[in-house]
Amino acid sequence: MSAILEGTPDKRLVLVTGRAYPELAEKVAECLGTEILETTSYDFANGEMYVRFTEPVRGADVFVLQCHSGDINKWIMEQLIMIDALKRASAKSITVVAPFLGYSRQDKKHRGREPITARLIFDLFHAAGADRIMTVDLHAAQEQGFFDGPVDHLTAMPVLLDYVRSALDLGNTTIVSPDAGRIKVSEQWAAKLGNLPLAFIHKQRDITRPNHAEAHGIIGDVDGRDCVVIDDM
């Protein structure tokens, strides 16, 4: 099986992946009936990374799949290097596939002299040579406007709804919003599952203390019920 999925003479699809989670790319390739383009990737002793593709990609539509989890900064950098290599190898188009887009939570300034790092990430992908970005459930849908090109903003809600329907007794299930920012999405979940009861956690976050939030109470009926908490990331 070829690593290049042939279409019309001017249409070739190529899937490449970084080292963060190659198992996902293998499943995608299986669904597409193709193979992942072989890539030589390794780290130098000083921490720098090297990437080279073993087959030509000239004129191909290339999808670069990388999961931004674990060592997030390393995997974003590796994906940027892959994009640069593809651009210099004359790929026809380059699509970034990042199921979880790193730094998506940092989409606005809370205080003075803070960065908007989500915008920076989109700018870096554009500067490296990406033509399009495909991602799932951004922290805020408005982030699509950070990229100067098409953004395919997918949602996992249909898949997760099917799981909840099959795994839980909906007659004894409550949808829970973990904070004020997720109430709207939690209402959508409750409606799609048959107008389930909705609860809300009153939570406050101290922006001066990283990774710290304090829950002050919960509004709604959760006693003895299965709770589905609709958080973002």
Where do the model's predicted regions map?
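PRPP-associated nucleotide enzymes
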Residues: 1-233
